[in-house]
Amino acid sequence: MVTKHQIEEDHLDGATTDPEVKRVKLENNVEEIQPEQAETNKQEGTDKENKGKFEKETERIGGSEVVTDVEKGIVKFEFDGVEYTFKERPSVVEENEGKIEFRVVNNDNTKENMMVLTGLKNIFQKQLPKMPKEYIARLVYDRSHLSMAVIRKPLTVVGGITYRPFDKREFAEIVFCAISSTEQVRGYGAHLMNHLKDYVRNTSNIKYFLTYADNYAIGYFKKQGFTKEITLDKSIWMGYIKDYEGGTLMQCSMLPRIRYLDAGKILLLQEAALRRKIRTISKSHIVRPGLEQFKDLNNIKPIDPMTIPGLKEAGWTPEMDALAQRPKRGPHDAAIQNILTELQNHAAAWPFLQPVNKEEVPDYYDFIKEPMDLSTMEIKLESNKYQKMEDFIYDARLVFNNCRMYNGENTSYYKYANRLEKFFNNKVKEIPEYSHLID
């Protein structure tokens, strides 16, 4: 359980109130002021006290000095004489400016924490309309759950994550995750997840996150390092987390040596180190002058590619050029992708999203010899297995026909198959060049 005292320690504001105090990053993400430095800086910074924040932050990552322009949110560092820069998300800039904070709260009956939890409850209820409101309220206020909230000062909740830790089993279940609809373009979601990962690792022995994601959230969780491949043994989590119909179980394995709030800087440093290594075995970094043959546009003559400086050294061959000219995917791929996405998002699609579980339906594969589901179709599409639209339609028909073959006419599954097939047929008919494929 997180106490009010612990929460306050995790969000000390002292380092941001003095404009010239250099911040020292600690492992638990608490910012501490060095006494000697603070006293010196106070004397030197009297003419800047009205700025309300320091301008630059310097830290060392991987042996390189990284300088952050806090006001503009631009990170710079030099590696092997090359300057690298990247721009922080607006949410990071706002946090550095003291406009927002990330606070961990639970139901400890303190007035302020209860206000934050109520704000989170309201956002979850609005952003997750398919969830019963009473169910959301019960879990948010449940004392076995913790929440990390994004708070715009002084006390406006703009989003957050509610999770349940299972410390002895070394994983936590993310129950709800949402950002207010008016705040979803500022990078709060990614920054919030990074804060949560660092907080959980530094305050517990949790190494994994599990969550059930609906079709609209899968993309977000993939970007945050989650995968549909569950490596945790079922005996660890089965029966402990909530199972949602139509949801996709996803897992995130946290890396022990990474500070996720610095992930952007670390990746940039890795890129710089990789470029240095490439320069030792390749000449791809050398910039060569343009070809003289193209200076006179009225007298352009054919040229042997092998005589172009650097091209042969790069490993180019005529066969590679022919391969590059060949289209990687057919013109039907975009249409298939759109139809498949709409199928997956349809209200009647939930029984067909994943393969039928043999443990739950032991005799299914005795009757169905050519099983198919929407996730398998997605994998085939990503692997470029659909050479023509007819192949995709064939698999879709398998999904519907298999369902009707195994289930009786009066079952809900049979009716779901009919509904989804009708929707599928209409979508294909909307595309003129493929409408003739539907009877």
UniProtKB/Swiss-Prot annotation:
Catalytic machinery residues: E173
Q: What are its E.C. numbers? A: 2.3.1.48, 2.3.1.-
Membrane-crossing residue ranges in chain numbering = none
Location within or outside the cell: Nucleus; Cytoplasm
Q: Where is the Bromo domain?
A: 327-431
Question: Is Ubl conjugation one of the keywords UniProt gives this record?
Answer: no
Report which reactions are catalysed by this protein.
L-lysyl-[protein] + acetyl-CoA = N(6)-acetyl-L-lysyl-[protein] + CoA + H(+); (2E)-butenoyl-CoA + L-lysyl-[protein] = N(6)-(2E)-butenoyl-L-lysyl-[protein] + CoA + H(+)
Q: Where's the N-acetyltransferase domain? A: 100-255
Q: Cite the CDD domains for this sequence.
A: Bromo_gcn5_like (cd05509), NAT_SF (cd04301)
Knocked-out gene: effects:
Sensitive to amino acid starvation. Increased sensitivity to genotoxic agent generated DNA damage.
> By its UniProt entry, which InterPro entries does this protein fall under?
Acyl_CoA_acyltransferase (IPR016181), Bromodomain (IPR001487), Bromodomain-like_sf (IPR036427), Bromodomain_CS (IPR018359), GCN5 (IPR037800), GNAT_dom (IPR000182)
Q: Which GO terms describe its molecular function?
A: histone acetyltransferase activity; histone crotonyltransferase activity; histone H3 acetyltransferase activity; histone reader activity; lysine-acetylated histone binding; protein-lysine-acetyltransferase activity; transcription coregulator activity
Q: Does the keyword Cell inner membrane apply?
A: no
Residues under site feature: Important for catalytic activity: E173
Segments carrying the region annotation (Disordered) are: 1-59
Superkingdom in the source lineage? Eukaryota
Please give the GO cellular component terms listed in this UniProt entry. Answer: ADA complex; chromosome, centromeric region; cytosol; histone acetyltransferase complex; nucleus; SAGA complex; SLIK (SAGA-like) complex
Comment on protein domains: The bromodomain mediates acetyl-lysine binding in histones.
Task: Spell out the family assignment given in the record's similarity comment.
Answer: Belongs to the acetyltransferase family. GCN5 subfamily.
Extra info from the record?
Answer: Present with 1180 molecules/cell in log phase SD medium.
Subunit structure comment from the entry: Component of the 1.8 MDa SAGA (Spt-Ada-Gcn5 acetyltransferase) complex, which is composed of 19 subunits TRA1, SPT7, TAF5, NGG1/ADA3, SGF73, SPT20/ADA5, SPT8, TAF12, TAF6, HFI1/ADA1, UBP8, GCN5, ADA2, SPT3, SGF29, TAF10, TAF9, SGF11 and SUS1.
What does the function comment of this entry state?
Histone acetyltransferase that acetylates histone H2B to form H2BK11ac and H2BK16ac, histone H3 to form H3K9ac, H3K14ac, H3K18ac, H3K23ac, H3K27ac and H3K36ac, with a lower preference histone H4 to form H4K8ac and H4K16ac, and contributes to H2A.Z acetylation. Acetylation of histones gives a specific tag for epigenetic transcription activation and elongation. Operates in concert with certain DNA-binding transcriptional activators such as GCN4 or HAP2/3/4. Its acetyltransferase activity seems to be dependent on the association in different multisubunit complexes.
Q: What PANTHER family does UniProt report for this protein, alphabetically?
A: GH11602P (PTHR45750), HISTONE ACETYLTRANSFERASE (PTHR45750:SF3)
- What this protein is called in its record is Histone acetyltransferase GCN5
Question: Which species is listed as the source?
Answer: Saccharomyces cerevisiae (strain ATCC 204508 / S288c) (Baker's yeast)
